[in-house]
Amino acid sequence: MLNKDQFADNHFIRTIIEDDLKSGKHEAVQTRFPPEPNGYLHIGHAKSICLNFGLAYIYDGLCNLRFDDTNPEKENDEYVNAIKEDVEWLGFHWAGEPRFASDYFDRLYDYAVGLIKDGKAYVDDLTPEEMREYRGTLTEAGKNSPYRDRSIEENLDLFTRMKNGEFPDGSKTLRLKIDMAAGNINMRDPVIYRIRRAHHHNTGDKWCIYPMYDYTHCISDAIEGITHSLCTLEFEAHRPLYDWVLDNIPALHATRPRQYEFSRLELLYTITSKRKLNQLVVEKHVSGWDDPRMPTISGMRRRGYTPEGVRLFAKRAGISKSENIVDMSVLEGAIREELENSAPRLMAVLNPLKVTLTNFQAGKTQSRRAAFHPNHEEMGDREVPVSQTIYIEADDFAENPPKGFKRLIPGGEVRLRHGYVIKCGEVVKDEAGNVVELKCSIDHDTLGKNPEGRKVKGVIHWVSAEHAAEIKVRLYDRLFTVERPGAVRGEDGEYLPFTDFLNPESVKEITAYAEPAAKDLPAESRWQFERIGYFVTDRQDHGKDTPVFNRTVTLKDSWQPK
């Protein structure tokens, strides 16, 4: 359930919007989230989703979902459907039907013809290599193309023939006629159409020319009546072109949008480059785009992150124009905080040590009911069964305990969570000297009450061996061992492959034992394993006969670089 307190406040974009509404510049807020359907959304997109949809929600406006699909070779319906699912999972709903930039291809073409007629666009025959030479540098002005002064009639004829497929791919482009000496290289006669025979996921084979992003984006905003077009800071240098295109198409003046930029999110210990994420998938460093170690929304969902937790993280990351570098612990902290309130509890033992209760008596030794959550009675309770053999965590026992150790030791006592106080009477070892079993006695007068005359400080979790559910547990950790895996240089000054810094211990699969309540859980069921961490039944692999739990996050932030 959304509420207006869930979104970042007191940032400069909210100030702009409030001033615009107060002055009457806009009667209502209209934003958009415009992903390119060429990959899966990641945590950086989640921040943008929360910003655009959140602002529309806060100010009772609307937010469109628009696919910027101008690059047909890299785009497909798989990504379209995945993006829609991710946005909905985060808790947002777009205005009307999803929109596509390709829905506007006819209008984009007509506007380009209008620019040619106004002498503001021309067909160019320069090759990509020649165009780079003519463009100049940051310190040197560019040169006019020898085709820049073609007549309007010739340009109209050539552009029509480009559309009709009379020229080879890449042989001609349509460029805006702006200023080859402009200090901003983006304004040096940018290309707005290129010839590319490629099947398009939405328009099929209707077109063999496709518009460029910078031309398409601003026009799409205007067509949809977007009031505040929000993008990350790398597009700040593109804003003059955004404005130029809209200023020079009179039909769009009535719905003139404005572009505002904010800093993109850089999350440490991961990467968000689609190219690099794709490399991880292709080279099988991960199991897929939804691998729980990936920073994709689908990966985070499978990891057990909640929409509420991701929205809380986006709020804490904030919106500004300054560098937005955020440690992974901030994301994990937001998820941990949300799950602390929402996740019911179970006990599970990941590294079992057998304990025999020597004075167990059927009929006398009793099970006890325990709440699923200490603060939410509505979640109900369950029986925590006990039997003569139980499992505890191996590291909850120490023969030679360190100072301050409050768990089980030879001759010592400890309370079983939701159960009795037990005392260790005998330690059984194998031939190699490894502890394989403890023999302990139960104090039958301690079920639900403290023992008389002594204090037992330690409390440990456990499961009944007779009743336990055998489960598969995947212990996930950070995918990389360094903060910025894509920005590490070698001795020669060149960047090292980011895959050199993959964490070899980013996933470990073990067999564990859990309370019987774990046997019949549906997929994507989130739980706290008491004293261990938060876990989720795997979205893909979990089943009644093969329970699979993914570790979402530990109870505390104890991560150390390997």
Curated annotation (Swiss-Prot):
Q: Which organism is it from?
A: Neisseria gonorrhoeae (strain ATCC 700825 / FA 1090)
What is the protein named? Glutamine--tRNA ligase
Its recorded reaction(s) are: tRNA(Gln) + L-glutamine + ATP = L-glutaminyl-tRNA(Gln) + AMP + diphosphate
- Read off the PROSITE patterns from this record: AA_TRNA_LIGASE_I
Q: Does the keyword Transcription regulation apply?
A: no
Q: What is its EC number?
A: 6.1.1.18
Q: How does it assemble?
A: Monomer.
PANTHER family in UniProt: GLUTAMATE--TRNA LIGASE, GLUTAMINE-TRNA LIGASE
The residues that the entry says bind ATP are 36-38, 42-48, 232, 264-265
Its family?
Belongs to the class-I aminoacyl-tRNA synthetase family.
Q: Where is this motif: 'HIGH' region?
A: 35-45
> Where in the cell?
Cytoplasm
List the SUPFAM superfamilies: Nucleotidylyl transferase (SSF52374), Ribosomal protein L25-like (SSF50715)
**MF GO annotations:** ATP binding; glutamine-tRNA ligase activity
What InterPro entries has UniProt attached to this entry? Answer: Gln-tRNA-synth (IPR004514), Gln/Glu-tRNA_Ligase (IPR050132), Gln_tRNA_ligase_bac (IPR022861), Glu/Gln-tRNA-synth (IPR000924), Glu/Gln-tRNA-synth_Ib_cat-dom (IPR020058), Glu/Gln-tRNA-synth_Ib_codon-bd (IPR020059), Rbsml_bL25/Gln-tRNA_synth_N (IPR020056), Ribosomal_bL25/Gln-tRNA_synth (IPR011035)
Enzyme class (EC, first level): ligase
Q: Which UniProt keywords apply?
A: Aminoacyl-tRNA synthetase, ATP-binding, Cytoplasm, Ligase, Nucleotide-binding, Protein biosynthesis
GO biological process terms on file: glutaminyl-tRNA aminoacylation; glutamyl-tRNA aminoacylation
In the UniProt record, what gene is named as encoding this protein?
Answer: glnS
Residues the record lists as binding L-glutamine = 68, 213
Q: Which GO terms describe its cellular component?
A: cytosol
Residue span of motif 'KMSKS' region: 271-275
